[in-house]
C-alpha cells in the first residue's frame, strides 16, 4: 500500500521540515509514502469573495491533477468528521483491507479545499475546530498516521 500526502504550499520553516522528515523516515517501514507540495496562489489581504473562489479553484485543479483515479481520498477540512486516534487507525486499516492501493490525504492552502476537491474526497476529516497553519497540519497529519500504524502494531507509542 502507498500513502500520498498532497499539500498546497511548501514547507519553509526548518523545524517543520525536520519533523516531517522524521515521521517520513518512521513511516517508510510500514508503507511507501509520497509527499507532493503544490504551489499556492498569493491571496491578497482584502481579497473579495470571488477572488478567494478563483484561488480555491486554481489550487483545487492542481490538487485534482495529482489524485489517482482509484485513490481513496481523505480531505482535511474543518467541517469534516473528527475521529479519535483508534478510529483513524481503523479507517486506514479498513481501506488497506478493502484493496485500495493508495490512500491520499489532501491539505488545502490558507483558504482550505475547493468544492471540487471536497466532492472528489471519499472522506472529509477534521482535526478539530482550531485554525492551524496548513504547513503545521502536514506535521500533525504525519504524526497521526504514524500513531495509527503504532496502534495497529499494538506498540506502547499510543497510550
From Swiss-Prot:
Its EC number is 2.1.1.177. InterPro entries: Alpha/beta_knot_MTases, RlmH-like, tRNA_m1G_MTases_N. NCBIfam families: PRK00103.1-3 (NF000985), tRNA_RlmH_YbeA (TIGR00246). This is Ribosomal RNA large subunit methyltransferase H. It comes from Streptococcus agalactiae serotype V (strain ATCC BAA-611 / 2603 V/R). Its main location: cytoplasm. It is found in: Cytoplasm. Signal peptide: none annotated. Gene3D superfamilies: 3.40.1280.10.
Amino acid at each position: 500500500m502507498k500513502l500520498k500526502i498532497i499539500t498546497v504550499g511548501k514547507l519553509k520553516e526548518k523545524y517543520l521540515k525536520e519533523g516531517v522528515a522524521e515521521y517520513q523516515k518512521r513511516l517508510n517501514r510500514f508503507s511507501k509514502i509520497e509527499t507532493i507540495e503544490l504551489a499556492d496562489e498569493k491571496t491578497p489581504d482584502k481579497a473579495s469573495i470571488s477572488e478567494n473562489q478563483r484561488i480555491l479553484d486554481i489550487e483545487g485543479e492542481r490538487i485534482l491533477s495529482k489524485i489517482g483515479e482509484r485513490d481513496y481520498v481523505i480531505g482535511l477540512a474543518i467541517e469534516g468528521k473528527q475521529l479519535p486516534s483508534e478510529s483513524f487507525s481503523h479507517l486506514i486499516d479498513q481501506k488497506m483491507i478493502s484493496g485500495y492501493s493508495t490512500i491520499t490525504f489532501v491539505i488545502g492552502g490558507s483558504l482550505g479545499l475547493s468544492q471540487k476537491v471536497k466532492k472528489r474526497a471519499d472522506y472529509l476529516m477534521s482535526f478539530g475546530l482550531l485554525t492551524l497553519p496548513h504547513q503545521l497540519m502536514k506535521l500533525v497529519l504525519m504524526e497521526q498516521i504514524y500513531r495509527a500504524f503504532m496502534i495497529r502494531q499494538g506498540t506502547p507509542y499510543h497510550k
